[in-house]
Amino acid sequence: MKKKSISLLYLISIVFLPWCISFTFKKSLESWFINWWNTSQSEIFLNDIKEKSILKKFIELKELFFLDDMLKECPKTYLQNLRTGIYKETIQLIKTHNEDRMNTILHFSTNIICFFILSGYSILGNQELILINSLVREFIYNLSDTIKAFSILLLTDLCIGFHSTRGWELIMGFVSKDFGFAQNDQIISGLVSTFPVILDTIFKYWIFRYLNRISPSLVVIYHSMND
């Protein structure tokens, strides 16, 4: 009982501790880092503006300047307000882009922190991980073949079923955003069309090589439920 409690606490710490540390790190440095970046990196931004979305917004501002030339007959106060508005929008655009870049850096940093924490768990907590593995194996072994077959069928339908495409798109979009990469629909579509197929092949091979050997009755129940 004591070993089970220790394993449960260890598993909870694996799940929540990396997230809590990375979240605290991000929130404690986010505001200071963004303010520093906005005050010291604006000139670098103006010399290195290549992103398509930012260019589109600057083109819109340029069109406003053309509109300014067309409105020369308007009162000077209106034209001055127009120039001031364009200037403010440009500054806001710089700050928004800088915040996006800083969030990308912070996301990448927190992911690196999580990786090192989990690596430390795997190296320093080898005995606890072995105990957790044995408890999970014991729990699965005590389940009936019907429940095992139902769980396998549910998991495969979620991962490689007909309606799993949208779920994979959301997962890959979230992962790319979390790592700070711009969402590319073509890359995501390519991964969605190939990754479930690879998983399906691996799963069928696993059934053929592993389940047929250790539990033929489970394979029979699975195929009957799948049909």
UniProtKB/Swiss-Prot annotation:
It is a multi-pass membrane protein. It comes from the Eukaryota. The keyword Repeat does not apply. It holds the Pfam family CemA. Keywords: Antiport, Chloroplast, Hydrogen ion transport, Ion transport, Membrane, Plastid, Plastid inner membrane, Potassium, Potassium transport, Transmembrane, Transmembrane helix, Transport. InterPro entries: CemA. It is found in: Plastid, Chloroplast inner membrane. GO terms for cellular component: chloroplast inner membrane. One of its GO terms (molecular function) is antiporter activity. The chain crosses the membrane at residues 5-25, 112-132, 143-163, 187-207. GO terms for biological process: potassium ion transport. It catalyses: K(+)(in) + H(+)(out) = K(+)(out) + H(+)(in). Belongs to the CemA family. Contributes to K(+)/H(+) antiport activity by supporting proton efflux to control proton extrusion and homeostasis in chloroplasts in a light-dependent manner to modulate photosynthesis. Prevents excessive induction of non-photochemical quenching (NPQ) under continuous-light conditions. Indirectly promotes efficient inorganic carbon uptake into chloroplasts. This is Potassium/proton antiporter CemA. The lineage of its organism: Eukaryota, Viridiplantae, Streptophyta, Embryophyta, Tracheophyta.
